[in-house]
Amino acid sequence: MIIYNTLTRSKELFVPLDVNNVKIYVCGPTVYDFAHIGNSRSIVIYDILFRLLNVLYPKVTYIRNITDIDDKIINVAQNNNQNIYDVTARYIKAFNEDMGRLNCLKPTYEPRATENIDVMLALIEKLINYGHAYIRDNTVFFDIQSYPAYGKLSGRNIMELIYGSRIDIEVGKKHPGDFVLWKPATDIDSKLMSCWPSPWGVGRPGWHIECSAMSYNYLGENFDIHGGGADLQFPHHENELAQSCCAFPNSYYAKYWIHNGFLTVNHEKMSKSLGNFLTVRQLLDSGIRGEVIRYIFLSTHYRKPLDWNDNVVSSAQESLNRIYMALNVTDERLLLDDVEVSDEIISCLKDDMNTPKAIAVLHEMVTRINKASDIDKKVYFIKVLIKSANFLGILHHSWQEWFKVDNDQDIIQLIHERKMAKTNGDFIKADRIRQILLDKGIVLSDNKDGTTLWYRS
């Protein structure tokens, strides 16, 4: 398998630390709201990676954390007169429901930050003892100047960090780029149950130490792959890498770093202030199916930017319709035990997760099905298509379910009358019946064998 490693800025042959247990850590959601489509693209991308690794290796340990303590969570809890656990329980449940409807597999473990406070405290104490962290007014900061390699992941140097970067400016820092490991509790924290005792007073962790603690707790000092969105490369992942390498001087933390590209909406950055903030829940409730959302994410290479717009949605719907239409040879669910996922699909994914090429292979399969004259061969091709598409997380419906086909006798009668009109050469009547059905929201598709597929648009 070849993957692009952000750390080396090059494609590399993937060589796991242990071929019997590949370890991967991915930054999951901060649960203060429903998951937006930018977050969800990342989840789908690493779901594909998880599926691929499970084919290539006997065991994969996939950790996707949940950030359940954060300023945004506290703000929501305060505004709704709730504690943080009430807020996070609601949105964790919603997140898992929504990702399920995108056909994402569950990770091996899904740790929560609040369940790993003791590990964070131990890491912070190590950083202080090793001279990589310091205390100012009950706040613990990481000293970036104590780590000469700081900036190697994002390609920034320390001087660049002073100007124009996303850095919290805190009084008492030795350097503007120093970041918080532990902060003292406020009265609001005490009220909302968002603080814990520590050697430096009651408080709560900084964001970056959370992922270092959870990855260490579940994967150890070193692991194979760290994934996340491009927006996390700096400062979050840079800070993770620094503090983990400093806490464990003989480690390198993650061997490979993978980052998926940005997502825009109508060529603009997604923002609540712009009114273009889209959640998966909104899209699902509006009638856009989970498979359509997933298909859109897979149609663009994970490292490239993706623009979400109405044309993209329509195109994905039409493409899936074409694939599903190829399944209408049989009314029964096909048993897939005697076929395997196409080698072409696996090869595409082994090449830096080239999902657009894998999608193209699915459409080539559809063409093969439509051209097949032998029914047994056609059914075999359909089974391979379904097995391969299922591996990508799509085509989990029958064609009847997808097109919402039912047994409306009036519609069937009109289709029969249209067929008779065509047989008798009365094409005007046949076209008129087609239009009548179209006005009722019924779309017809004539097959070469003389049968007609219909579905509700």
From Swiss-Prot:
It is found in: Cytoplasm. CDD domains: CysRS_core. It is an enzyme of class 6 (ligase). A motif ('KMSKS' region) lies at residues 269-273. It catalyses: tRNA(Cys) + L-cysteine + ATP = L-cysteinyl-tRNA(Cys) + AMP + diphosphate. One of its GO terms (biological process) is cysteinyl-tRNA aminoacylation. This is Cysteine--tRNA ligase.
